[in-house]
Amino acid sequence: MTKRKFVRFGLTIAALALLVTASGHAWGYTHENRLTFSRPVALPGVVLPAGSYSFDVASPTALDVVVVRNARSGKVLYMGFTNTVTRPRAMSPNTPIAFGEATANEARPIAAWYEIGATLGHQFLYR
């Protein structure tokens, strides 16, 4: 009888652990930031017109891959690898974008995206 109780107890603990893990993923942390630009901006290989966009990581296991979607339609407009970079000390934790330089007639390139409040960001790779 004690062996049966021990096995039953072990199975109950295992089921509880699976339940806690599954609910943790359902209520997990999201990396998404919705950003609005009043002028066109550029990412490697694409120019985004003025508008609202969702910046996110591809998955919790691929933090170096960033996906940018149209905020309304959800259509993927950009997906690419990034380098992890530290937020500059002088940059506010509420500033999500660092821009690169462009001429007057070009869209400003987004150099890096920093999740709001995060100390690390995603540097876009231009070639």
Where does each model-flagged region fall?
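N-terminal secretory signal peptides that target proteins for export/translocation
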Residues: 1-6
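Bacterial N-terminal signal peptides
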Residues: 10-21
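Short acidic, Pro/Gly- and aromatic-enriched capping/linker segments at domain boundaries
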Residues: 22-42
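A short tyrosine-centered beta-strand micro-motif
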Residues: 51-56
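Short aromatic-glycine-enriched beta-strand elements
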Residues: 62-66
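Mid-chain, structured segments of secreted extracytoplasmic proteins
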Residues: 68-115
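Short, low-complexity, Pro/Ser/Thr/Gly-rich segments in the mature regions of secreted, periplasmic
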Residues: 117-126
